[in-house]
């Protein structure tokens, strides 16, 4: 599990090197909470990167991902999609819960007001960075548990590993 946090000044201007260090080595697996794609959506909307940094990222990301895959990295890009209503429900739950209040930041409250901008940047990201070698897999995440199980099931089906068995549907499910 990898969560890099707020980038340093150097990391902000050396974006791919920052994330390259977080990728797994041969025989390892990494799950990234967020990824280099914060540069494609969150950072430009919230003013955390310049327009030039955003455009450079969008221009170079597909080639960088191809290089990683050519070096043996198996890359699966999940986008956990949430409806605006569900996002608002989760924000209210965080705000009003003694167990979840710590999850809520001022940034979260700003983000919900920029839903349309996030939607636009998300669509641009999908259109420009979903490739044959590295497509986006969008998962409905209104139900967290089902979303997590769906993503794990996807990985188990997609990944080759020793002793893998593909179960056939039972008769009643056909």
Residue ranges and their predicted role:
Residues 1-58:
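Conserved nucleotide-sensing/catalytic segment adjacent to the nucleotide-binding pocket
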Residues 2-3, 78-81, 138-140:
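Conserved beta-strand segments of the P-loop GTPase G domain that flank and frequently precede/overlap
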Residues 9-12, 38-43, 84-92, 146-149:
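Switch/connector loops and helix/strand junctions flanking conserved nucleotide-binding motifs
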Residues 21-25, 67-73, 129-131:
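Conserved catalytic network of the ASCE P-loop NTPase/AAA+ motor domain
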Residues 30-32, 76-78, 137:
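Hydrophobic/aromatic beta-strand patches that form the interior of the parallel beta-sheet core
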Residues 34-35, 79-84, 142:
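A short beta-strand-to-loop transition that corresponds to the Sensor-1 phosphate-sensing loop
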Residues 43-60, 68-120, 168-171:
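A glycine- and Lys/Arg-enriched "phosphate-lid" helix/loop adjacent to the NTP-binding pocket
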Residues 120-174:
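NTP-dependent small-molecule kinase module
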């Amino acid at each position: 599990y990898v969560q890099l946090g707020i980038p340093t000044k150097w990391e902000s201007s050396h974006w791919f090197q920052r994330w390259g260090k977080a990728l797994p080595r041969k025989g390892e697996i990494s799950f990234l909470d967020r990824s280099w794609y914060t540069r494609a959506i969150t950072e430009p909307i919230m003013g955390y990167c310049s327009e030039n940094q955003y455009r450079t990222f969008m221009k170079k990301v597909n080639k960088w991902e191809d290089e990683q895959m050519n070096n043996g990295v198996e890359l699966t890009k999940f986008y956990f999609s949430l409806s605006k209503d569900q996002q608002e429900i989760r924000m209210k739950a965080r705000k009003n819960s003694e167990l979840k209040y710590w999850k809520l930041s001022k940034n979260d409250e700003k983000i919900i007001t920029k839903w349309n901008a996030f939607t636009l940047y998300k669509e641009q990201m999908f259109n420009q960075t979903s490739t044959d070698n590295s497509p986006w897999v969008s998962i409905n995440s209104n139900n967290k548990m089902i979303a997590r199980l769906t993503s794990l099931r996807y990985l188990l089906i997609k990944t080759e590993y020793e002793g893998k068995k593909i179960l056939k549907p039972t008769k009643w499910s056909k």
